[in-house]
């Protein structure tokens, strides 16, 4: 059994979150006003320069559109879903999977070919990644930033990406009170939402259709190089659920190393706010391997 056929798509999707970092770079959205005050004494002349920054207030229309987008994201505490995952390429591969989430706490992905036997498991708790390879009895236990080329990531951002929800890095899921933190542009009937504060080295934005259904997430490195990749996620099949709008189909294109990678996720159903079990235990007879072995574990051997 080739684990690459089943688990690598999930790893690729997590890698979307390479945009998440610890250093913010503000996009110019402000006006600077400089005032100078001069104080003179018999011996000393002091000049003090003070710079104040004023953020441009969002328009009424922008506030309205952002509120409609944000209000489409309903509240939830837990999630269980079935589905399938496939990799594009010369030989498309697919597998059934089960997904469980506890909001803001954990993600559990069980890879089950034919929907029967679990061959691999990926668990993220907080900012820690656990990958269990059941066929070869080995595991990886590392920081979740292993999936994002060393850039910090947390489980909440991953959950938003999996469900097709806009977010502002460092502030969480987009809500109606965040209109002043984003810019909104109507481009040929498509609403583009772009956080004013971008993270160092990357830029990201979200696009929604006229019904406020998410269409895409784009994460682009500021400086193009072989060490960083552009991540694009296309969403479709948006449906209304107990937790608001949810994209049931997710299609991602990126790179793993220098190799192009495409991914399709198709959710078959959602169950909300019921008790879920997240198994993050490591079997006692399994061998730990280093994070640098990640792609080697899930190779085509």
Describe the function of each predicted region.
Residues 89-116:
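Structural recognition of beta-strand segments within beta-rich domains
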Residues 5, 22-26, 174-287:
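Gly/Pro-enriched, hydrophobic low-complexity segments
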Residues 78-83, 94-96, 111, 122-126, ...:
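Extended beta-sheet lipid-handling architectures
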Residues 1-8:
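Bacterial N-terminal signal peptides that target proteins for export
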Residues 16-19:
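C-terminal motif of bacterial Sec signal peptides marking the signal peptidase cleavage site
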Residues 106-160:
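An acidic-aromatic
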Residues 144, 148-183:
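C-terminal low-complexity, charged extensions that often adopt amphipathic alpha-helices
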Residues 21-94, 291-301:
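N-terminal leader/targeting segments and the immediate start of mature chains
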């Amino acid at each position: 059994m080739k684990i690459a056929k089943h688990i690598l798509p999930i790893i690729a999707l997590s890698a979307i979150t390479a945009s998440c970092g610890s250093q913010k770079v503000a996009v110019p959205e402000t006006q600077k006003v400089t005032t100078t005050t001069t104080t003179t004494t018999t011996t000393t002349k002091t000049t003090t320069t003070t710079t104040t920054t004023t953020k441009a207030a969002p328009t009424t229309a922008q506030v309205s559109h952002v509120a409609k987008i944000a209000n489409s994201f309903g509240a939830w505490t837990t999630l269980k879903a079935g589905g399938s995952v496939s990799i594009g390429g010369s030989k498309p591969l697919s597998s059934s999977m089960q997904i469980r989430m506890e909001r803001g706490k954990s993600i559990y992905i069980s890879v089950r070919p034919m929907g029967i036997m679990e061959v691999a498991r990926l668990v993220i708790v907080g900012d820690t990644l656990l990958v269990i390879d059941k066929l070869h009895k080995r595991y990886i236990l590392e920081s979740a930033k292993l999936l994002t080329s060393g850039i910090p990531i947390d489980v909440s951002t991953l959950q938003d990406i999996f469900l097709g929800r806009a977010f502002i890095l460092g502030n969480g899921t987009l809500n109606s009170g965040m209109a002043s933190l984003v810019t909104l542009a109507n481009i040929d009937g498509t609403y583009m939402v772009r956080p004013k504060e971008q993270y160092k080295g990357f830029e990201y934005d979200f696009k929604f259709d006229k019904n406020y259904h998410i269409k895409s997430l784009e994460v682009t490195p500021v400086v193009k190089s072989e060490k960083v990749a552009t991540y694009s996620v296309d969403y479709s099949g948006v449906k209304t659920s107990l937790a608001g709008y949810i994209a049931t189909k997710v299609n991602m294109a990126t790179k793993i190393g220098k190799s192009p990678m495409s991914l399709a996720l198709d959710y078959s159903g959602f169950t909300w706010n019921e008790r879920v079990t997240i198994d993050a235990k490591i079997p006692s007879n399994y061998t730990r391997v280093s994070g640098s072995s990640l792609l080697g574990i899930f190779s085509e051997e």
